[in-house]
Amino acid sequence: NVPVISYLFLKGKCAKCKVGISVRYPLVELFTALACTFAAYQFGVTSQALWAVLFTYILVALLFIDLDKMLLPDQLTLPLLWLGLLLSTQHIFVGTTDAIIGAAAGYLSLWSVYWLFKLATGKEGMGYGDFKLLAALGAYTGWQGLPIIILLSSFVGAIAGILIMVIQNKGKSLAI
């Protein structure tokens, strides 16, 4: 990946002004390259691989926007959802019925958790972007993929949240 190599070659500094460049940029590039390579490897040389790589790019963008802003913008989640539904008409990842049920189940499952949490605590536990993202993921994987997505994302989110709380020393007051 050129940005990673140039970052190493320039020792993390701008070629013109010599100001330091955050290590985050090459790490995001490296992560994206690895994730896209994995996606392409899973599907081989097919149109499915191209769609999987595009899907991966959008998910990486959503990941880092969410980390920075605690926001999953509609400008990315909704096109991702509609693209998944559109691709299902050609059975690229799943069929149309599975995609529609997956999108509805994804949205409604987190919507239900949101309202149960809000009724129990009086607080919002997540944003609506989370519902839309899980709906989009359901459109790509069908309802069958949702349990593992929820399980893995809960596990990764818990580990990341604990690490952030420890590193930032904020304890339970930190919103994750």
Task: For each feature predicted by the language model, list its residue ranges.
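Membrane-proximal soluble regions of multi-pass membrane proteins
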Residues: 1-24, 174-176
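Hydrophobic, aromatic-rich membrane-embedded alpha-helical segments
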Residues: 2-9, 147-160
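Select subsegments of transmembrane alpha-helices in polytopic membrane proteins
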Residues: 21-30, 74
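Membrane-embedded alpha-helical segments in integral membrane proteins
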Residues: 30-42, 83-87
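Membrane-embedded alpha-helical segments of multi-pass transporters/permeases
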Residues: 37, 41, 89, 111, ...
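Transmembrane helix-loop-helix
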Residues: 40-51
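Functional transmembrane core segments of multi-pass inner-membrane proteins
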Residues: 49, 54-57, 61-156
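Interfacial loop-to-transmembrane junctions
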Residues: 127-129, 163-176
